[in-house]
């Protein structure tokens, strides 16, 4: 079971979220049949969305769009405050580029572009916020977004590690944020600890990476666990939803589908589930329009 744990330092100067997103990213890889670099890029964006959604309340939905100029194309993810996230990468077949230590790089495949966050509070008029991609490695881009757009100094670490067959081995991350009222010496102490943290990939390799992340963030400093919540890859598509989408088409288009294709087949971009609509379904939609 994937989870996100929310914590706050005893002094109230900082808060931290730590995530285990292994099954989330594994499910995404299975559904989209992504290659190595596209798996890591999509996985990191899913984790980034889970972090942002954890910052929200109510029935808020967050869409993250990584709009890069390179071969991966767009990466789109949607997360809500109930722990659900879904997403896809435009070009899932982008393959591997590794460092000398075996780390999978995604920046060259993302390229230059924008990090766009759409926040929908469920009352209409979603709020859009855009910052430039500074590296294309997603974690650094999220930290820059939080610092620039939300004016909240933030440290972010997130990654997806693959096994020898390029299947998801482990995925997760953390967010640390300065809270109002933090003293300069507290900020300096935490900044030093973050700078001295082992690489996120090293922490994720630990037997209990959640505890390893918390230990790396807080050291010997006291903190409180505020909550532990389940997170998951979950798409909200349905036959009814796509039926409504077909209903928005002109009658002439529906008639053409009925006569030439004898139905319609729609595949959800977010989870690759296929929905079939027969001539009877199309006839019903045409009749409702008349």
From Swiss-Prot:
InterPro entries membership: Heat_shock_Hsp33 (IPR000397), Heat_shock_Hsp33_C (IPR016154), Heat_shock_Hsp33_N (IPR016153)
Keywords (A to Z) from UniProt: Chaperone, Cytoplasm, Disulfide bond, Redox-active center, Zinc
Transmembrane segments: none
Gene Ontology molecular function terms on file: protein folding chaperone; unfolded protein binding
Protein's name according to its UniProt entry: 33 kDa chaperonin
Function noted in UniProt: Redox regulated molecular chaperone. Protects both thermally unfolding and oxidatively damaged proteins from irreversible aggregation. Plays an important role in the bacterial defense system toward oxidative stress.
CDD domains: Hsp33
Species lineage: Bacteria, Bacillati, Bacillota, Bacilli, Lactobacillales
Similarity comment: Belongs to the HSP33 family.
Gene: hslO
Keyword Chaperone found: yes
Pfam families xrefs: HSP33
NCBIfam families with a match to the protein in the record: PRK00114.1 (NF001033)
Top-level division of the source organism's lineage: Bacteria
UniProt keyword annotation of Cytoplasm present: yes
Places the protein is found: Cytoplasm
Coiled-coil positions: none
Cystines in this chain: 235-237, 268-271
GO cellular component, one term: cytoplasm
A single BP term in Gene Ontology: protein refolding
Record note on modification: Under oxidizing conditions two disulfide bonds are formed involving the reactive cysteines. Under reducing conditions zinc is bound to the reactive cysteines and the protein is inactive.
SUPFAM superfamilies: Hsp33 domain, HSP33 redox switch-like
């Amino acid at each position: 079971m994937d989870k996100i744990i929310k914590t706050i330092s005893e002094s109230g100067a900082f808060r931290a979220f730590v995530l285990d997103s292994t099954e989330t990213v594994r499910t995404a890889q299975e559904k989209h049949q992504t290659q190595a670099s596209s798996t890591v890029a999509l996985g990191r964006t899913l984790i980034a969305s889970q972090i942002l959604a954890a910052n929200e309340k109510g029935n808020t939905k967050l869409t993250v769009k990584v709009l890069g100029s390179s071969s991966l194309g767009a990466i789109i993810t949607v997360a809500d405050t109930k722990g659900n996230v879904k997403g896809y990468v435009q070009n899932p077949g982008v393959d591997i580029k590794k460092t000398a230590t075996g780390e999978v790089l995604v920046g060259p495949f993302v390229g230059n572009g924008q990090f766009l966050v759409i926040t929908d509070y469920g009352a209409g008029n979603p709020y859009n916020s855009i910052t430039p991609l500074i590296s294309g490695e997603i974690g650094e881009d999220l930290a820059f977004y939080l610092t620039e757009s939300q004016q909240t100094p933030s440290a972010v670490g997130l990654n997806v590690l693959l096994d020898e067959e390029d299947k998801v081995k482990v995925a997760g991350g953390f967010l640390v944020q300065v809270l109002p009222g933090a003293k300069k010496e507290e900020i300096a102490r935490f900044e030093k600890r973050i700078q001295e943290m082992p690489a996120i990939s090293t922490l994720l390799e630990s037997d209990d990476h959640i505890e390893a992340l918390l230990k790396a963030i807080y050291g010997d400093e006291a903190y409180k666990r505020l909550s532990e919540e389940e997170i998951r890859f979950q798409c909200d598509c349905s036959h009814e939803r796509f039926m409504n989408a077909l209903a928005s088409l002109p009658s002439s288009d529906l008639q053409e589908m009925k006569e030439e294709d004898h139905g319609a087949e729609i595949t959800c971009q977010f989870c690759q589930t296929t929905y079939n609509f027969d001539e009877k379904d199309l006839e019903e939609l045409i009749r409702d329009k008349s």
